[in-house]
Amino acid sequence: FSAAFLTQLVRFHWKAFPLLQVWGQAGAGKTQTVEPFSHMHYHLKMPKKISAAGNTFFPMVAAVTQSASLPVIFEELKPRQMAKFQLDQVQNLLRTNYNGERLERGSVNRDVAGGGTVVNGYDNVAPIMFIGEALESQSAILERCVSTPLSKEDRDGRSDEFEYCYARRQGGPISWLGRSMIDAALAIKPDLVRDSVAKYRDLFKSKVSRRVYEDQNRPWH
């Protein structure tokens, strides 16, 4: 969520931005964990979440093309409960978001006598985060994701801290932090983002094995 403020700068340099996948068993607190962080991008309004299984495709396309830095959150990504055509559309949306590819849809032109078809283009550039109960199985999507597993055991002993943050999620300290990040993102120089990433890649290289470092198909932003 903090990196989303720099989405456009990251895409400018590397033509890519990874997706975030939060997955785990029912009751692990996936949505309740995501919501406070999403308030870095919202102040008094509640963050918008879209059900991947309960919506038609066009509202999802509209969401990922309306902003280049506001995270879009897809809930209820349950492949077993989705029709094949619907699942193919959602997976294509996720897969093409990594490189910010353009989506195109055909429609009938009602402004011209006799009709006719037109092709509308949409830039799939908003940072995407999706929530599900199982790890995404399609390798083309998985290799473009930062995967974050959660379980019920992760919540043990942390309820007081979580309740403190959750109760103050709307218009509170998390929103103020987000405003500070917006100001910093607007003031940052594009070259600083590039140089900082290069610096931390070198640090990462010195800390891990060669095999891990050379797995460049995994997102590292």
Which residues fall in each region the model found?
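P-loop NTPase catalytic core of nucleic-acid-dependent motor ATPases
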Residues: 1-54
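Residue-level preference for the first positions of well-ordered beta-strands
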Residues: 17-21, 71, 127
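Flexible phosphate/Mg2+-sensing switch loops adjacent to catalytic phosphate-binding sites
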Residues: 41-65, 105-106, 153-162
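Active-site-adjacent structural elements in folded domains
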Residues: 50-60, 108-116, 206-214
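Conserved nucleotide-sensing/catalytic segment adjacent to the nucleotide-binding pocket
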Residues: 59-112
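Conserved catalytic network of the ASCE P-loop NTPase/AAA+ motor domain
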Residues: 63-67, 86-87, 119-124, 137-141
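Structural recognition of the conserved hydrophobic beta-strand(s) that form the central parallel beta-sheet
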Residues: 73-75, 106, 122-133, 147-149
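Phosphate-sensing "switch" segment of ASCE/P-loop ATPases
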Residues: 122-124, 139-221
